[in-house]
C-alpha cells in the first residue's frame, strides 16, 4: 500500500496496513496548517488567562483549580506521568501502532490544540518503528482510554518504555536509537494526547478485520463439511433467501452456492435424507446474522476511526472552546460487545458441525475419522478443544458495555468499559479462529473417506491449501501443531485467497 495520508478519510485497510505491515504515514501541509491554527489559539488562551478546562485549569475533580502560565508545562508532564498507571501484559505491537495512527488521525483534524511538531513525532514513531510499551488493563472507556494513551505518550517526553527492533528500552534510550529528542509539552498537549477512544478503537478495528476474514472462512469450512456429509444445498436456494430480506443471509447463501458449485458430493432432497440438520440447512441464516452484525460494527468503527474524541474541543474559526463528551466510548463499547457475540456464534455452529463430522452416528464415517479406532483415537479430542473454546466464548460474550462504575470523585460518573469489550472481542476472535481451524482439519480428514477429487473447484482449492500444511491422518500424532498451522492459514488470509483465486471474491 502507498503511504497513508493523515487527515483524509482513514479506512480499515489503511489501519491494518500501518499496524501490521509497516505502511508509512505522511502529514500534508494542509494538516500542518490546520493543526497550527488550533495551537496558536491555545497559546492565546493561555496569554489571556481565560478559564478553559485542561488548558488553564486542572483535570477531572480539579477542573475548577486555576493553573498559571508558569505551571502549564508541568501540568501537561504531570498529567502523562500520573495517568500512566495501566497494568497487565503489554498490548501487541500491532495494537499500539494502530493506537498511534488513530490518535494522530484525530489530532490531525485541528480541533485539539496540539503543535505540529508533536503530531510529527507521533508519525515518526510509526515510520521509524518505535513502539511504546502499553499495558493492556486500566481503561474505563471514559474519559476515553486515559491510562493506555498515557503509556503510549510517555516516550514523547523521554519516559516510559518502547520497543525498537525487537528490543525493549527506556523511553529516553528508544528515542536516542531512532534519532529523536524528547519533547517539552505545552498547554493542552498532554490532555490532547490521552483523552480519546483510540485503545478500544485500535483493538476493535484489527478485530473487525480479522472477523471479516473469519466470516469468509466460516463459509469455506461449512461448505467443506457440507460436502463431506452429503448436504442438500437446496436449502440455500436464492428463492428461499429472497423471502427473507436479511442481506447478510442472502450473501452467505450466495457464498455457499458458489463454494459448492460443481460438487459431486452434495445431494438432492430424498437422495440420502429429506432435509439436513440445522447446522447445515440454516447456515445462511446463522452465518448471515453474524455477517449483518459485523457490517454494523464496521460502520461504527469507520465513524470512530475518523472522529475527534478529546475534550475540550477548539473551533478556531469561531474563536470558541467547548467542553463536550466525545471521549465517551459507549458507541464503540456497544459495537464491540456485538462483535464478540456475532463472532462467538460462528464458533458455536462450527463446533456442532465438528461433532457431526467425528460422530459416526451422525456422519456415517469411521468414528473420530480414524481407520483404526481403539488403538487410535483419531480426531476425538479436537472436538473437546473446540467445545472448550466455544464454552469460554460464552463467558467472554457477556457484555462489558452494560457495566459502569463512577470515578474521579463522581465527576466522571458513567463510563463505557469499551476497552474491556475490545479485549474480550479480540480473545473471542482468536478462539473462533482455532475452532474453524479444527473444523478445517476434521472436514479435510472426512473428505479422505468420501473422495476429495469429487469436491467442488472452490473447496478443492481449500482442501489443497490445507494439505500443503497438514498431512492426512494415517495414525495418531500430536495434533496441536496442525491446529495452529491451520489457524495461521486462516489468520494470514491465505486460505481465503486460495479459494477466491478459483471462485472469485466471496462476500
UniProtKB/Swiss-Prot annotation:
Gene3D superfamilies: Fumarase/aspartase (Central domain), Fumarase/aspartase (N-terminal domain). Pfam families: Lyase_aromatic. Its main location: cytoplasm. GO terms for cellular component: cytoplasm. One of its GO terms (molecular function) is histidine ammonia-lyase activity. Contains an active site 4-methylidene-imidazol-5-one (MIO), which is formed autocatalytically by cyclization and dehydration of residues Ala-Ser-Gly. InterPro entries: Aromatic_Lyase (IPR001106), Fumarase/histidase_N (IPR024083), HutH (IPR005921), L-Aspartase-like (IPR008948), Phe/His_NH3-lyase_AS (IPR022313). It comes from the Bacteria. The modification 2,3-didehydroalanine (Ser) is found at residue 143. It catalyses: L-histidine = trans-urocanate + NH4(+). There is a cross-link at residues 142-144 (5-imidazolinone (Ala-Gly)). CDD domains: PAL-HAL (cd00332). PANTHER family: HISTIDINE AMMONIA-LYASE. This is Histidine ammonia-lyase.
